C-alpha cells in the first residue's frame, strides 16, 4: 500500500503532454484568438529531439563491473515547477458613445463618432464623397487586401445620422470605419503608390541624385504601415500641402501628410492599427539613422524641427529636450549583447533601468542606438521585445464589476476562451414547501437581475419585501425601452414573464397554507414544518428557540403538554396572520404593477404615435427642402448658361464689335434720315392742305358776305319807308 501510495503521489504526466498543456494554457490566457492560435507541433518536435538525445546517451556502452549487476534504476523526468497563475482578463465596459463630430478626409468633411479614443467615420459618406469615382468591386478588393474591418453602428448612432440628414430615413444600417483604416483605404485607391512611367525614371533619378548630393536635403523616414525612406527639402515646404519629400523608391514628391501614408514595403495588413492621423505627421517623420556624426545629427535634427514647427498653428509640436550624454547607458549594451541568456536578478534590474532610460526625455534624441531603442511614434507592437525586455507585475488587478455580468455590457465579439468570473454565490436557504420561491433555475443573462439584488432578495425572506426586487428591473426596462413597436412587445412580454412567477408563488403558498389550519394539534412537528418561511428571521429564530427549550425541558405532565400545544397553536395563528398580510400586500403590489404597466403601455403608444408624426413631418420637410434645392440648382444652371452666353458675347474682337456698332448706328441714322424726309414731305403736304383750306374758307366767307349783302339791303329800305310814313301821320 505504501508503495502504491508513493507511486501514485510521485506520478507525473508525460513531458510532451505537460509542455503542450502549459503552452495551451499560456496561449489561451494571453491571446484573444484562444488556444486555436497555438500549434503543439513544435513542442512535440522538441520532445522528440530530447528523447533522441537521451536514447543516444543511453546507447553509449558504460563500463559495468563483472562482479554483480546493479538493479535497474528508473529515471523519471525532472519535475518542472508549475507555471505561475496568471491573472484574469481585464474587463471594461464597451464604449457606446453617440456624440457626433466631424473630421477632414482628403479635403472632405466626414461625420464620425469617437469610440474608445478612435474616430469611426461614416462609410457611406466616404463612398459618396471621397471614393465616388471608384466602384464597389474595386473598394471591396482593396479592403480585402488591407484586411480592413468595418463595424456596424448602434441604433442610437444610426438615428443621429438620420436626423442630421447624412443618411436617409430608410437606411437599415450604416458601416463605420476607423480613421486609420480610412486613411489606408483612400491612399491605396487614390494614390496607389505606383511607380512613375519608364520615360520619366531617368529624369527622376537625376533629380533624386541632385537632391541627395545637395546639402539642403535631409534624409528622413517613417514607420507607418511599412517603413519608407525619403528626402526632405526644407526650401520646398512653402505651404502646408506643398510637396517637399521625395520617396527614395518611386522618386515621387509628396507632402508630409501624404508621405507618412506612402509605402512600398510590407503593408502590415495583419497588424491592428489604432490612432493614426495624417495630421500628426510631425510625430511620425524621423531623422534617418544613416547620419552618424554628432554635429551632423544636431544640425539636421534642428533643421527637421524647424520644418515641423512651420505652419503648426495649433502648437502641437514641441522640440525635444537635448540629450545629456551621447553614449547609451551600459545596461543597454549589455542587454543587447546577451539577448539569449536567461535574465538574472541583476540583468532584470538593468532591463528595468533600460526601460526607464527609454522613458526618460534624455533618450528621446538618441540617433544611432540599437533599433530596439529607437523612438518611433507609430511602431507596431512587437511581442518578442515585450516578452524579452518587459516583465509583467506578478499580480494584476482583475476589475470585474457585478453590473457587467450581463452580456449587453460587453462587446458581442468576445473570444470564447475569455472566461468571465462567476457571479456572487447565492445563499441557499432551506425553506419549507410553502415558502415563496425566490431563486429559480438558471435563465439567460438577458432576463436575470443583478446578483446583488438577488442576494438581497434571498437574505430578506419577508413576503412584503419580495416583489421589490422584481419591480426594480421593470422600471429599469421601462427607462431603457426604445419607442418602437418591437421594443414595446418585448417590454410587455418581459413584464408578463416576471409577474407570472409571483402569481404562482402566491397561489402555491396560499394553497399550501390554507389546509394547514385544519391540521390537528397532535402533530406539532408537521405544523412547524408547514409554517411559512416568509416571516422575519428574528421572529422565526425566537419561535424555534422557544420550541427547542420546550422540547429540551421535557413534557412529562399533562399540563406541560397542553401548554406546549397551546403555544404551538398560538404560533401557528400568528404565522397565518403574517402570511395573509403578506399575501394581501403582494396582491395590492401586483395590482399596482398592473396599473403601472397599463399606464406605461399607454404612454409608450402615445410616444410612438408622436414619434411617427414627427418622422412624417421631418420626411415632408426633407421632401420640400429637396424640391427647393432642385429648383435652386435648376435656376443656378440657367443663370450659369446665361452668364456663359454673355461671356461669349463679350469675348468677341473689340474692333469687330466697334465696326458692328458703327454699322448699326449708321443704319439707325439712315433710318432716322428717311423718317425725317418723310416727315418733311408730310409737313409740306399739310402746309399745302392748310393753304387750300384757308383759300376755301376765304372763298366761303366771301360767298357768305355776298349772300348777306344780297339779303340785308331790302329789309333796310322797308324800314326807312315805314319811318317816313310814321312821321307823316302825326
Curated annotation (Swiss-Prot):
InterPro entries: c-SKI_SMAD4-bd_dom (IPR014890), DHD_Ski (IPR047315), DNA-bd_dom_put_sf (IPR009061), SAND-like_dom_sf (IPR010919), SKI/SNO/DAC (IPR003380), Ski_DNA-bd_sf (IPR037000), Tscrpt_reg_SKI_SnoN (IPR023216). GO terms for molecular function: DNA-binding transcription factor activity, RNA polymerase II-specific; DNA-binding transcription repressor activity, RNA polymerase II-specific; protein kinase binding; RNA polymerase II cis-regulatory region sequence-specific DNA binding; SMAD binding; ubiquitin protein ligase binding; zinc ion binding. Pfam families: c-SKI_SMAD_bind (PF08782), Ski_Sno_DHD (PF02437). GO terms for biological process: negative regulation of activin receptor signaling pathway; negative regulation of BMP signaling pathway; negative regulation of cell population proliferation; negative regulation of osteoblast differentiation; negative regulation of SMAD protein signal transduction; negative regulation of transcription by RNA polymerase II; negative regulation of transforming growth factor beta receptor signaling pathway; positive regulation of DNA binding. Its main location: nucleus. Residues 460-472, 492-508, 524-534 have a biased composition (Low complexity). The keyword Phosphoprotein applies. Residues 473-484 have a biased composition (Acidic residues). Ubiquitinated by ARK2C, promoting proteasomal degradation, leading to enhance the BMP-Smad signaling. It is found in: Nucleus. Residues 321-356, 452-538, 708-730 are annotated as: Disordered. One of its GO terms (cellular component) is nucleus. The keyword Calcium does not apply. Keywords: Coiled coil, Nucleus, Phosphoprotein, Proto-oncogene, Repeat, Ubl conjugation. The modification Phosphoserine is found at residues 382, 431, 479. Belongs to the SKI family. May play a role in terminal differentiation of skeletal muscle cells but not in the determination of cells to the myogenic lineage. Functions as a repressor of TGF-beta signaling. This is Ski oncogene. It comes from Equus caballus.
Amino acid at each position: 500500500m505504501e508503495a502504491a501510495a508513493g507511486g501514485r503521489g510521485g506520478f507525473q504526466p508525460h513531458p510532451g503532454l505537460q509542455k503542450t498543456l502549459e503552452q495551451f494554457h499560456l496561449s489561451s490566457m494571453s491571446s484573444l484568438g484562444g488556444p486555436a492560435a497555438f500549434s503543439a507541433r513544435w513542442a512535440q518536435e522538441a520532445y522528440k529531439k530530447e528523447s533522441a538525445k537521451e536514447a543516444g546517451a543511453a546507447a553509449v556502452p558504460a563500463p559495468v563491473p563483472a562482479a554483480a549487476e546493479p538493479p535497474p534504476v528508473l529515471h523519471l523526468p525532472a519535475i518542472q515547477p508549475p507555471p505561475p497563475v496568471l491573472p484574469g482578463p481585464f474587463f471594461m465596459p464597451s464604449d457606446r458613445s453617440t456624440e457626433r463630430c466631424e473630421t477632414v478626409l482628403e479635403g472632405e468633411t466626414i461625420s464620425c463618432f469617437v469610440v474608445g479614443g478612435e474616430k469611426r467615420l461614416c462609410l457611406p459618406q466616404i463612398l459618396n464623397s471621397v471614393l465616388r469615382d471608384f466602384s464597389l468591386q474595386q473598394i471591396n478588393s482593396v479592403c480585402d487586401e488591407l484586411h480592413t474591418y468595418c463595424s456596424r453602428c448602434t441604433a442610437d448612432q444610426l438615428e443621429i445620422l438620420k436626423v442630421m440628414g447624412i443618411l436617409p430615413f430608410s437606411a437599415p444600417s450604416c458601416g463605420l470605419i476607423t480613421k486609420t483604416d480610412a486613411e489606408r483605404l483612400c491612399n491605396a485607391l487614390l494614390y496607389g503608390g505606383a511607380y512613375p512611367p519608364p520615360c520619366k525614371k531617368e529624369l527622376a533619378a537625376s533629380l533624386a541624385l541632385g537632391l541627395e548630393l545637395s546639402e539642403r536635403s535631409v534624409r528622413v523616414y517613417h514607420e507607418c504601415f511599412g517603413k519608407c525612406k525619403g528626402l526632405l527639402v526644407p526650401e520646398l515646404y512653402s505651404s502646408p500641402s506643398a510637396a517637399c519629400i521625395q520617396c527614395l523608391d518611386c522618386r515621387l514628391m509628396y507632402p508630409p501628410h501624404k508621405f507618412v501614408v506612402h509605402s512600398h514595403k510590407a503593408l502590415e495588413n495583419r497588424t491592428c492599427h489604432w490612432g493614426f492621423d495624417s495630421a500628426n505627421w510631425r510625430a511620425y517623420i524621423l531623422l534617418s539613422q544613416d547620419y552618424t556624426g554628432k554635429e551632423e545629427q544636431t544640425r539636421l535634427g534642428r533643421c527637421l524641427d524647424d520644418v515641423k514647427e512651420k505652419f503648426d498653428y495649433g502648437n502641437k509640436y514641441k522640440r525635444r529636450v537635448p540629450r545629456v550624454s551621447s553614449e547609451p547607458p551600459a545596461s543597454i549594451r549589455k542587454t543587447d549583447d546577451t539577448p539569449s541568456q536567461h535574465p538574472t536578478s541583476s540583468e532584470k534590474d538593468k532591463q528595468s533601468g533600460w526601460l526607464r532610460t527609454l522613458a526618460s526625455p534624455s533618450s528621446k534624441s538618441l540617433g544611432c542606438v540599437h533599433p530596439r531603442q529607437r523612438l518611433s511614434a507609430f511602431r507596431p507592437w512587437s511581442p518578442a521585445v515585450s516578452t524579452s525586455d518587459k516583465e509583467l507585475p506578478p499580480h494584476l488587478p482583475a476589475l470585474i464589476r457585478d453590473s457587467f455580468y450581463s452580456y449587453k455590457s460587453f462587446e458581442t465579439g468576445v473570444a470564447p476562451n475569455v472566461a468571465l468570473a462567476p457571479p456572487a454565490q447565492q445563499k441557499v436557504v432551506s425553506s419549507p414547501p410553502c415558502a415563496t420561491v425566490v431563486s429559480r433555475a438558471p435563465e439567460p443573462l438577458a432576463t436575470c437581475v443583478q446578483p446583488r439584488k438577488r442576494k438581497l432578495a434571498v437574505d430578506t425572506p419577508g413576503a412584503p419585501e419580495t416583489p421589490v426586487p422584481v419591480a426594480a428591473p421593470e422600471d429599469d426596462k421601462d427607462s431603457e425601452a426604445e419607442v418602437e413597436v418591437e421594443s414595446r412587445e418585448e417590454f410587455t412580454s418581459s413584464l408578463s414573464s416576471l409577474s407570472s412567477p409571483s402569481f404562482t408563488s402566491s397561489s402555491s403558498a396560499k394553497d399550501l397554507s390554507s389546509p394547514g389550519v385544519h391540521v390537528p394539534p397532535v402533530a406539532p412537528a408537521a405544523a412547524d414544518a408547514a409554517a411559512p418561511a416568509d416571516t422575519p428571521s428574528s421572529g422565526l429564530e425566537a419561535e424555534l428557540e422557544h420550541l427547542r427549550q420546550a422540547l429540551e425541558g421535557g413534557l412529562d405532565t399533562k399540563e406541560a403538554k397542553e401548554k406546549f400545544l397551546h403555544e404551538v397553536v398560538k404560533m401557528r395563528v400568528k404565522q397565518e396572520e403574517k402570511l395573509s398580510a403578506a399575501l394581501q400586500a403582494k396582491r395590492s403590489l401586483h395590482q399596482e404593477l398592473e396599473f403601472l404597466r397599463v399606464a406605461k403601455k399607454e404612454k409608450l403608444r402615445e410616444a410612438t404615435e408622436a414619434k411617427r408624426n414627427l418622422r412624417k413631418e421631418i420626411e415632408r420637410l426633407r421632401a420640400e427642402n429637396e424640391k427647393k434645392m432642385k429648383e435652386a440648382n435648376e435656376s443656378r444652371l440657367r443663370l450659369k448658361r446665361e452668364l456663359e452666353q454673355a461671356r461669349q458675347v463679350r469675348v468677341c474682337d473689340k474692333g469687330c464689335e466697334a465696326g458692328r456698332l458703327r454699322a448699326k448706328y449708321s443704319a439707325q441714322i439712315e433710318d432716322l434720315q428717311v423718317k425725317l424726309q418723310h416727315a418733311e414731305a408730310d409737313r409740306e403736304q399739310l402746309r399745302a392742305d392748310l393753304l387750300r383750306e384757308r383759300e376755301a374758307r376765304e372763298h366761303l366767307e366771301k360767298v357768305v358776305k355776298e349772300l348777306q349783302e344780297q339779303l340785308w339791303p331790302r329789309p333796310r329800305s322797308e324800314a326807312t319807308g315805314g319811318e317816313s310814313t310814321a312821321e307823316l301821320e302825326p
